[in-house]
Amino acid sequence: SLCNLALLTGHVGKWGSGLVPLRGQNNVQGGGDMGALPNKFPGFQDITNAEHREKFEAVYGAKLNPEDGIHLTLMFEAMGRGELTAAFVLGENPADSEADIDHARKLLSGLDCLVVQDIFMTRTAELADVVFPASVAWAESDGTVTSSERRVQRTRPAVTPPGEARHDIDIMHELGQRMGVDLGTTEPEA
């Protein structure tokens, strides 16, 4: 409704006007920019577009699914039907952030395998079969975060991650290796 109102009143595409949505989680914009969406590759390129898909298949060295994935709401519906039996939750806490937390906790608890990668032992992590302790982006990791206004901010480590905590990219890289997939470099510049 707000988007429609902004369009109707001419407040889109003009300097100093428009909407800046408040997102529910940190770095949602940056995640979308990098392709962490069920229907988009990096740069918001459509998964269902054969030309886009072929370009990323060449870069990734793998055949990619030509169909859109499902978003969180549909994932919980699929859990309820028994169609989704495992989940890897990275930097989210759906056991506390979903609208119906009791229902979310029941569904997460019923999975055959729940893996959580997070900086805290969240309620979701408490339900997990496997927990990967991650480092904090703002103080312990090298990379970028993007605000809702699309301002990209560089982050550099100021301290070493505590205990067994590791950078997200290092955890994902090792998981790939253990599954026989070379995810390439772990350098954030790539």
Briefly describe each language-model feature range.
Residues 1-15, 20-189:
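Non-catalytic alpha/beta scaffold blocks inside enzyme catalytic domains
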